[in-house]
Amino acid sequence: MPLLFKKIKDLRNFLKNKRCEGKEIGFVPTMGYLHEGHRQLIKLARMQNDIVVVSIFVNPTQFGEGEDYDRYPRDLERDLEICEEEGVDVVFAPEVDEIYPKGYRTKVCVGELGKVLEGEFRPGHFDGVATIVVKLFNIVQPNRAYFGEKDYQQLKIIEQVVEDLNIPVEIVPVPIVREEDGLAYSSRNVYLSPEERESALSIYKSFLLAEKMIKAGERDAKRIKEAIRAFIERHPHVKGVDYVEITDQNLNPKETVEKGDRILVAVRVGNARLIDNWKVQS
């Protein structure tokens, strides 16, 4: 079983000793309810580091009013079992008041990149993400940290924060992991009924449709985005498409689509809000 730490002080003491022994530390920050996508992050961390630390913390500051903080799935026992299966050395699962004690005041503001796409629909979300990630980097002080490309905007923002604040950690991006039918793994998939899940597959199918259009010579981003939106919206349990955007790899919007660009979507299906993205292959 991995060592479980709840207190910053105890974790720091343990890791300080490991660093003194010359051990390299890989870090996977999560909100728990681990799935196959997390396993891939952990596997890569395990291959590249002497010590693997996984944090499990549902961070309240990245949830807005009326979002799913209270109902976000939690199961520490199951998470610990998965961590054990994947050879994790340390799990850090603090309480909220350990991370944000009474009187906590400071936050990281990420600027323009945090106001578009997800940021438009979840104001302040990325400031909350950046704040907790910087805190965790300061607590763990890892050599490398692992982030999935499924949360592509989050990944780009963390890269920006690390660069801008001179944080000495290597950010390692890990490709999206999909279920057999193409649905991207997400802790929020648990909210979907079987029928809703069927409708959620329209996201992946819309990427294949876009890829087909691009392969056939369509390069107009507006037309491709319209086709994606129309395809997803005609599925029965889709309550709305928050956005469909096509950007370069640094999230600058594109008018003409090229290989390597990103298609990013956010879709509300039943009670779940799902985000996904696709790297243009053609």
UniProtKB/Swiss-Prot annotation:
It is found in: Cytoplasm. Pathway: Cofactor biosynthesis; (R)-pantothenate biosynthesis; (R)-pantothenate from (R)-pantoate and beta-alanine: step 1/1. GO terms for cellular component: cytosol. Beta-alanine binds at residue 62. It holds the Pfam family Pantoate_ligase. Keywords: ATP-binding, Cytoplasm, Ligase, Nucleotide-binding, Pantothenate biosynthesis. One of its GO terms (biological process) is pantothenate biosynthetic process. The keyword Lyase does not apply. The reaction proceeds by a bi uni uni bi ping pong mechanism. This is Pantothenate synthetase. It comes from Aquifex aeolicus (strain VF5).
